[in-house]
């Protein structure tokens, strides 16, 4: 597979280093921007951020972001982590095709959580887009959304119906294909998971604005459903990645490169 075009990430605070694939790494990973144009998160989404900090970080016009999915090739298998928005201008499938991977080539899709910008690309006209794939969804997450007052969101119900018996609910600690490890990182949503393959940590929505939240994890985006848990998860995952030397890849990072914490 071709390597993704490297898009640089502005220096965040001196604690980050952008880094690409390690030579000889077993898993080949590609971050795919689903959004067709550069994207920022409005600063207002993060509450009241002191003007001095805004100036220091250079984020007055918004926090650089993206809507992304992650494609991994390992051991002859093709895995997708989340599936983007599924909008008409989605870049996920076209970019996969550029990399030589068709939707029907995907063996497994792993979902971090059930927000629309992560599952919107799973279903088209009521049918599964990844027709040969098993869909792995955290049980805590799916159960929480299915039991919400007023019923499950339509896109969640469509996902369940479209994938049918190929939808696999799992709990932390369950064996997943290829040795993929799922770790609970609750707070953004009730059952948000991050995934590890080799030394690569796919962190979902741990951070929506990495330029702000990496150094200041106490700031939550409006989308975090349980802010106290989200802050705790954000701190824990970053510290874990630092301690283990794992590279983080996030669905709202503004770079196709991973980020290693120094």
Placement of each model-derived feature along the sequence:
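Positively charged n-region of N-terminal signal peptides that target proteins for export
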Residues: 1-4
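Cap/insert and terminal regions of metallo-dependent hydrolase folds
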Residues: 21, 199, 203-262
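Conserved beta-strand hairpin/beta-sheet module of binuclear metal-dependent hydrolase folds
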Residues: 24-27, 33-98, 194-206
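Active-site environment of divalent metal-dependent phosphoester hydrolases
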Residues: 39-40, 114-121, 189-193, 208-212, ...
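Active-site HxH/HxHxD metal-binding segment of metal-dependent hydrolases
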Residues: 84-163
């Amino acid at each position: 597979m071709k390597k993704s075009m490297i898009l640089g990430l502005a220096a965040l605070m001196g604690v980050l280093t952008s880094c690409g694939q390690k030579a000889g790494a077993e898993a080949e990973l590609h971050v795919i921007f689903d959004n067709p144009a550069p994207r920022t998160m409005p600063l207002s989404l993060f509450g009241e951020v002191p003007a001095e900090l805004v100036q220091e970080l250079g984020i007055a016009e918004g926090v650089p972001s993206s809507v992304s999915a992650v494609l991994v090739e390992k051991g002859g298998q093709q895995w997708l982590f989340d599936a983007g928005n599924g909008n008409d201008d989605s870049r996920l499938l076209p970019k996969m095709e550029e990399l030589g991977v068709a939707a029907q080539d995907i063996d497994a899709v792993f979902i971090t959580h059930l927000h629309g910008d992560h599952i919107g690309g799973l279903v088209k006209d009521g049918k599964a887009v990844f027709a040969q794939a098993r869909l792995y969804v955290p049980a805590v997450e799916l159960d929480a959304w299915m039991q919400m007052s007023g019923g499950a969101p339509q896109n969640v119900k469509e996902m369940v119906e479209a994938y049918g018996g190929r939808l696999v609910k799992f709990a932390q600690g369950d064996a997943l294909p290829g040795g993929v490890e799922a770790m609970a990182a609750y707070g953004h949503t009730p059952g948000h998971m991050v995934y590890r393959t080799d030394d690569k940590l796919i962190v979902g929505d741990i951070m929506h604005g990495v330029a702000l939240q990496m150094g200041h994890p106490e700031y939550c985006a409006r989308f975090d459903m349980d802010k106290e848990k989200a802050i705790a998860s954000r701190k824990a995952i970053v510290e874990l990645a630092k301690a283990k030397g794992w590279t983080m890849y996030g669905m709202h990072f503004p770079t196709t490169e991973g980020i290693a914490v120094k």
